[in-house]
């Protein structure tokens, strides 16, 4: 038996509006909503555990091959085990035991209605196998059991490839005549690398692989002979054309594959303060062969926030906007913004502020929705919440549209993502500024009804946003979810994110900073009559542009709390400063934010604030101070 989306929504709305005793009597119906959404018509991704994905002819339902689009036919959900393991900035290897444990976690989450279509295996290969063999110490019998269990449970397996860069892999004999001068990468347009690489992709397709992730591409690689005779532009053009043609042929032969592009295919993802348009532009012809292009691994933006994880949200939001401005459709951008894990690559986040990160990933409108990391960190109750958000947005992505609005996140302007269908709209709105701001939630289409009677569905703790008509008032650094039309219903309430706390008020404090010694600024202020102090340090280079400090990644790097320091004293006595950025951060950081609690200083005596950078060459530091009340 199957249901339409509208039938499911009607059931949910009806059950949730019943009195409590009736809700209990109708609990089976509500459980079907939470756990049985995979039976909704037009969503045949989940089948009997022992059955593979059916074809259209077998079910009479939806099948990708029945559509005309050559790529990106429908939203999908991907699990990737990167950040559950980490061998680059940590020492946790990718073992068969770890991978199979996460597969069991996928099956656990499915019981609560969570959808996964693909399992992407990250760096799996033996360094001497030319992408044909798995690492023996960790995969003694190869991948067969993993592939078999995935497919038995209706999950399609995928593999990560370092493309033509020799990242933790040695050149196979067939690649030797494609190597560049430093023997770190292979040309796509010369020698035997590309033919052998494409044969390898086909080899894995024939073994059941259906998704391929291409990372670390070096499109400027050329043999020493070619480097002497051709320009960099000619070399790059030849590589792009050769690889794109090869992927086209591969897709034509295997039309059900999903191909995802990561590092190396365009865009500047190091920070949110870089120039735009991108210095490394995105070649839109890649959309002919890739289902998605990613917009950067999670990292802090150059927007200072007391909550470190919110600055990371802003980074992913900013990069999606920049890729959209580079003319990529939102559905083709993989924001890669949601990672769980206790590893260096995700800054030992575990599940901190995970709900806001997940909501934002869904709200950005990408059709390749990737979840990374330790799924066991999600409780059963978390899984129910996850499934509820997923069901809301997968319906809107599949049937409706997603659009951006407001300012550019990295420019510290309020912004958001809106999704609509003919029955209503939902808006995720973010205020990145150190001020209370109001932002309009515009109509997303001419056929959309005017926004009125909106409902606040989700928010951070602390400041209580106020929705008035088509506007919302947000606290500093706050995000919220608002529903209109059908979605302005208790059925879509998502609760409060308690591990992100927003001040109920914020006011600037008069503070004049002046140089004290090298890479140090100092100010003396009169303590405010009430509230805590928030101190913000921003680092710039001698050219006036935002500059990140890079004191090394884990495990041997220096903590950012030592690289960018905030110090407060009163009468010669040190005052504690609470910070959340004291982490070893592989991606660098350009700011520091800290707070001093009101009870730790005397009101009648001035405070001395010192902000410093450990950079060896001269930098420019900017300091700001605010009074905040929680």
Task: Tell where the protein language model's regions lie, with residue ranges.
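N-terminal secretory signal peptides that target proteins for export/translocation
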Residues: 1-24
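Bacterial N-terminal signal peptides
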Residues: 28-39
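Conserved structural scaffold segments of CAZyme catalytic domains across common CAZy folds
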Residues: 43-168, 367-410, 419-425, 432-437, ...
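Active-site-proximal substrate-binding groove within the catalytic cores of carbohydrate-active enzymes
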Residues: 80, 243-466, 471-485
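Hydrophobic alpha-helical scaffolding
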Residues: 92, 96, 136, 190, ...
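Aromatic- and carboxylate-enriched substrate-binding clefts and catalytic-loop regions
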Residues: 115-338
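C-terminal beta-sandwich/jelly-roll accessory domains of carbohydrate-active enzymes
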Residues: 402-413, 422-423, 429-630
